[in-house]
């Protein structure tokens, strides 16, 4: 029997919630009370030079408490759930070794699931295969590749739109590298390891009792991003010439809509409306993920004292005052 199975797992508090739910305020409130280091659970914050559209913590906020997994890769590159899992487990160990407390905070539920439930044995990205698929798509179009996917993996193809280039490419890549449909690999038992077994992850979920209030916040937040120069930020990224709208970074909510606007495909008002709608759809998916976690501790994120409630819940987790 391993040492990790003999000893009691270390409790790790996880502050999860949809966009605009107040995660940053709650995390900073905890930082004022305890020696924490924040590990971001956000697939958009990993990218450098994408500050406004991702609502990245300010320099002052990041100076007041150590943050990790922010600004770690270039927008031209990809960052997988497997990389997040490995990096997070390493960081947790390092933070604990320093005598400090890790706090996981974010809203990318796929990352959290990979961390806490393990990974499927999917092959990694292959630049040559992706280049070949990109060339095929440039010649024949993504709907043709979607039809190709339907022949080898009908289950995956059935849930993807014909122009969902990123996911179609990944599903075809997996089949070409493994010889098996992605749907079959995802249905296989997940791989776990002793590194994750050493921890007990306890989610504190910021959820709205009235989704309309959160929708209003989302609209206000998107308008504030536009006022802060979001379009200029996307324009600077476009001038690099090595980015395109099918990259994971440029598919982030808001960036895709701004790119379409700068391409002349939509007007400003339509871009704004589509950006707000896409953010609300993301929020809906995040809440659905959260509600599938029966072990979560729920805090109403639109309550007047939401930050204080979240702080109390996090401290109860860290003090061991929660059921096992």
Curated annotation (Swiss-Prot):
Reported cofactor(s): Mg(2+)
Catalysis: reaction(s): adenosine(37) in tRNA + dimethylallyl diphosphate = N(6)-dimethylallyladenosine(37) in tRNA + diphosphate
Membership in a protein family: Belongs to the IPP transferase family.
Single GO biological process annotation from the record: tRNA modification
Lineage: Bacteria, Pseudomonadati, Pseudomonadota, Betaproteobacteria, Burkholderiales
Region described as Interaction with substrate tRNA: spans on this chain: 42-45, 166-170, 251-256, 284-291
Amino-acid positions noted as binding substrate in the UniProt annotation, renumbered to this chain: 19-24
Molecular function GO labels: ATP binding; tRNA dimethylallyltransferase activity
Record: residues binding ATP: 17-24
Enzyme class: transferase
HAMAP family membership: IPP_trans (MF_00185)
Taxonomy, superkingdom: Bacteria
Functional summary from the UniProt entry: Catalyzes the transfer of a dimethylallyl group onto the adenine at position 37 in tRNAs that read codons beginning with uridine, leading to the formation of N6-(dimethylallyl)adenosine (i(6)A).
Site (Interaction with substrate tRNA): 108, 130
EC number(s) reported in the record: 2.5.1.75
Name listed for the protein in its UniProt record: tRNA dimethylallyltransferase
InterPro entries documented for this protein: Dimethylallyltransferase, IPT, P-loop_NTPase
Record carries keyword ATP-binding: yes
Keywords: ATP-binding, Magnesium, Nucleotide-binding, Transferase, tRNA processing
Subunit structure: Monomer.
